[in-house]
A protein has these predicted regions:
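N-terminal auxiliary segments of SAM/dcSAM-dependent transferases
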Residues: 1-54, 58
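Class I SAM-dependent methyltransferase SAM/SAH-binding core
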Residues: 88-154
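Core SAM-dependent methyltransferase catalytic element
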Residues: 258-298
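A short acidic, Gly/Pro-enriched loop at the edge of an enzyme's catalytic core
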Residues: 153-165
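C-terminal alpha-helical "lid/dimerization" subdomain adjacent to the S-adenosyl-L-methionine
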Residues: 202-264
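Conserved alpha-helix/loop element of class I SAM-dependent methyltransferases that forms part
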Residues: 67-92, 103, 107
Length: 298
């Protein structure tokens, strides 16, 4: 099965872009997908949007720091964290947008002493959990609360000062209509020629197929029982978002995994989309614009 997005209104080079092949559904999975039914009412959708921050804050209140496992795979999966250096011990400045309670942040800081990190999250409670972590060192990490769809990152991060932006399982939690605002925001702090590393839920992931009727908000967009939302990406949709934000696609691939529960005899096919995008270089004559820079990391 190949997912194809219409190319109307897109640059010619993008319209000709070959789509990746999505996971092929079984007959039972297709039946389950058809059972998702009608969309959630506009009234409830607007309420979910208004209460998005509250719902994520309640999520972290319930689960504290226990829900997600530490992501020790980030440096292994994204070779760009090594490749973007000109020499081995070069210091890197990264931004983790949507850091949660630090499951990706702290393993990276532990593994690489030459990283300084900015990190932000929608949830004030998640930010406090990061600051309370024994591994939190203000000399190596600056964490702050931020709604990436409306709060200006330049209030916290100097313009064009970041070598790598991590977008790991965060964009899916944002309404698709507001995703372009997030990308415009992060591009302001990313250096020209540097990259965004993305990983998130892919089309037909097991989590998507598990939703029941009354959960569908839009195409590939769903709400969980706790009010948090999740979008399931195609590579074409993601490439269009970044292209329209002025970035160039470097690499995109679907990552297919299987979660096995031997005790229950269950096998769950997982689908993630992993991609890299680059902010184009610009002429040396045009300097960065923005706020007065903060003191840089030492």
């Amino acid at each position: 099965m190949t997912t194809v997005l219409p190319g109307a209104g897109l640059p010619k080079s993008f319209s000709a872009r070959a789509e990746l092949r999505a996971r092929v559904l079984s007959a039972e999975e297709e039946r389950r997908l058809r059972g998702h039914g009608a969309l959630v009412s506009d009234f409830r959708q607007q309420k979910l949007e208004r209460e998005a921050r509250r719902n994520w804050d309640l999520f972290y209140k319930r689960n504290r720091t226990r829900f997600f496992k530490d992501r020790h795979w980030t440096a292994r999966e994204f070779g760009e964290l090594r490749a973007c250096r000109q020499f081995e011990d070069q210091k890197l400045t990264i931004l983790e947008a949507g850091c949660g309670v630090g499951n990706c942040l702290f393993p990276l800081l532990e593994e690489d002493p030459n990283i300084f990190a900015y990190a932000c999250d929608f949830s004030p409670r998640a930010v406090e959990y990061v600051k309370q972590n024994p591994l939190y060192d203000p000399g190596r990490c600056r964490v702050f609360q931020c709604d990436l769809t409306c709060d200006d990152l330049l209030d916290h991060v100097p313009p064009e000062s970041v070598d790598v932006v991590l977008l790991i399982f965060v964009l899916s939690a944002i309404h698709p209509e507001k995703m372009p605002l997030v990308l415009q925001n992060i591009c302001k702090v990313l250096k020209p020629g540097k990259r965004v590393l993305f990983r998130d839920y892919g089309l037909y992931d097991h989590a998507m197929l598990r939703f029941k009727a009354g959960s569908k908000l839009g195409e590939n967009f769903y709400v969980r029982q706790d009010g948090t939302r999740s979008y399931f990406f195609t590579d074409g949709f993601l490439a269009r978002l970044f292209t329209e934000a002025g970035c160039e696609e470097v690499l995109s691939t679907y990552v297919f995994r299987e979660t096995v529960n031997e005790k229950e005899g269950l096998r769950a096919p997982r689908v993630f989309l992993q991609s890299t995008f680059q902010k184009p270089l610009r002429s040396a004559a045009s300097g960065p614009r923005g706020r007065v820079p903060h003191p840089g990391p030492s």
